[in-house]
């Protein structure tokens, strides 16, 4: 009997590769350190190239199947639509409007719902073992052993490291590779509003869009819909900007080495800085000194991970292959990590299908296909954060150019 493929991590990439392998009758087991009730209820943006790859791999499922299962506004019959408009968070005025004829190419997805939907997209149940925190990986391609802190030990043909930016697999196999901290400030808040209050406070500004994107002078304050229930709306917000810290200046909000406990505390400097921004409604009604202590607030430290081809080749000899953030983590704000994690999982599963007898060739083929895409994505993600946090004068210039182009297009049409 062929030893199973051992997948470390039950996030998006781990569940996706497991689901596709299971659908192809390739034995595999997913190991997850946390308990089944863990929550990552925030929403993410799925781009068309990401969800199309996933839907195709799951048997050419229609897009509506996905949106019915994962869209934050699915209870209203929504499709996770966002208008991609940018508004001045000081005045509330529309700065950059999208082309009204543009096709929807981004779907917002509730992360919890997406994990469930992926796991359920097949006849046979995926095998997930919760409460299994990895201790060690040993062996070579075709014969690897994973040992867990609870004493469990499993032999497999291959270990797929799908365990994120702080990958336990990577820290053992490639201990010299550690995440780089990106010098940016990101605070993330979660809250819940009664439906009526949401309809009165947010809907007049956002309309049917699942994101109300507010930009300021070098800082952003998006408000996003995470999930809508019959009685309440779960929202989150972010306050983000580049760090101002240098040798002469200390940035009180840039805390790259903050502990897990400290990351959940609201620093007084955050309240002071937000108060100084003079935000317009509805941002001012959520982001203020009275409201913030009632929210769940987190200081997100943005990290990137990059590896060399020599690194992954060395890991391959030890029977390990990487997918998702374990080998190409990107900043949460402005990155496309979730999409690349899905595509990684699809491409690795495709490479493995029918090649169980030649795992080395399958893994090499996967890296050959994914390498350039992932390396360029990490590089772009660093640049994208700063592009999304421009000075207001640049946003105004962009807005004027778009107005001129729209006017010229209108003249040409007549």
UniProtKB/Swiss-Prot annotation:
Protein name per Swiss-Prot or TrEMBL: FAD-dependent monooxygenase adaC
Entry keywords, A to Z: FAD, Flavoprotein, Monooxygenase, Oxidoreductase
GO function term, MF aspect, one: FAD binding
Enzyme class, broadest EC rank: oxidoreductase
Record: residues binding FAD: 32, 43, 115, 325, 338
Pathway membership, UniProt: Secondary metabolite biosynthesis
Gene name of the record: adaC
Family the UniProt entry places it in: Belongs to the paxM FAD-dependent monooxygenase family.
Cofactors named for this entry: FAD
Top-level taxon: Eukaryota
Lineage of the species this protein comes from: Eukaryota, Fungi, Dikarya, Ascomycota, Pezizomycotina
Pfam families associated with the record: FAD_binding_3
Reaction equation(s) it catalyzes: 3-(2,4-dioxopentyl)-3,6,8,9-tetrahydroxy-1-oxo-1,2,3,4-tetrahydroanthracene-2-carboxyl-[ACP] + NADPH + O2 + H(+) = 3-(2,4-dioxopentyl)-2,3,6,8,9-pentahydroxy-1-oxo-1,2,3,4-tetrahydroanthracene-2-carboxyl-[ACP] + NADP(+) + H2O
Physiological role: FAD-dependent monooxygenase; part of the gene cluster that mediates the biosynthesis of the linear tetracyclic TAN-1612 neuropeptide Y receptor antagonist. The decaketide backbone of TAN-1612 is synthesized by the non-reducing polyketide synthase adaA via condensation of one acetyl-CoA starter unit with 9 malonyl-CoA units. The FAD-dependent monooxygenase adaC then performs hydroxylation at C2 while the polaketide chain is still attached to the NRPKS adaA.
Keyword flag Oxidoreductase: yes
Enzyme nomenclature, EC number: 1.-.-.-
């Amino acid at each position: 009997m062929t030893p199973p493929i051992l997948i470390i991590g039950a996030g998006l990439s781990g569940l996706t590769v497991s689901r596709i392998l299971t659908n192809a009758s390739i034995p595999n087991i997913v190991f997850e350190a946390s308990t089944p009730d863990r929550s990552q209820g925030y929403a993410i943006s799925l781009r068309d190239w990401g969800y199309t790859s996933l839907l195709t791999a799951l048997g050419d499922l229609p897009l509506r199947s996905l949106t019915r299962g994962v869209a934050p506004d699915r209870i209203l019959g929504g499709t996770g639509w966002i208008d991609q408009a940018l508004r001045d968070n000081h005045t509330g005025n529309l700065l950059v409007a999208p082309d009204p004829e543009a096709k929807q190419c981004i779907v917002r997805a509730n992360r919890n719902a997406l994990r469930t939907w992926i796991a359920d997209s097949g006849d046979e149940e995926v095998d997930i073992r919760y409460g299994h925190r990895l201790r060690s990986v040993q062996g070579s391609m075709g014969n690897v052993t994973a040992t867990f802190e609870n004493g469990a030990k499993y032999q497999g043909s291959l270990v797929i490291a799908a365990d994120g930016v702080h990958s336990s697999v990577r820290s053992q196999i490639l201990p010299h590779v550690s995440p780089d901290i990106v010098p940016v400030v990101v605070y993330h808040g979660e809250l819940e509003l009664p439906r009526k209050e949401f309809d009165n406070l947010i809907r007049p500004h956002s309309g049917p869009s699942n994101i109300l994107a507010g930009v300021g002078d070098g800082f952003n304050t998006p408000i996003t819909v995470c999930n809508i229930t019959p009685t309440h709306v779960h929202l989150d917000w972010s306050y983000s900007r580049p760090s101002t810290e240098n040798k002469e200046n200390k940035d009180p909000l840039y805390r790259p080495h903050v502990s897990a406990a400290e990351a959940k505390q609201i620093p007084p400097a955050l309240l002071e800085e937000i108060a100084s921004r003079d935000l317009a409604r509805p941002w001012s009604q959520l982001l203020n000194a009275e409201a913030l202590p009632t929210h769940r607030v987190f200081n997100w430290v943005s990290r990137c991970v990059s590896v060399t081809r020599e690194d992954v080749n060395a890991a391959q000899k030890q029977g390990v292959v990487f997918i998702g953030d374990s080998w190409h983590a990107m900043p949460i704000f402005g990155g496309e990590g979730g999409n690349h994690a899905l595509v990684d999982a699809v491409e690795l599963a495709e490479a493995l299908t029918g090649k169980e007898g030649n795992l080395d060739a399958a893994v090499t083929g996967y890296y050959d296909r994914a390498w350039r895409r992932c390396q360029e994505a990490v590089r772009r993600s660093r640049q994208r954060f700063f592009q999304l946090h421009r000075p207001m004068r640049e946003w105004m210039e962009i807005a004027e150019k778009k107005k001129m182009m729209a006017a010229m297009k209108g003249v040409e049409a007549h």
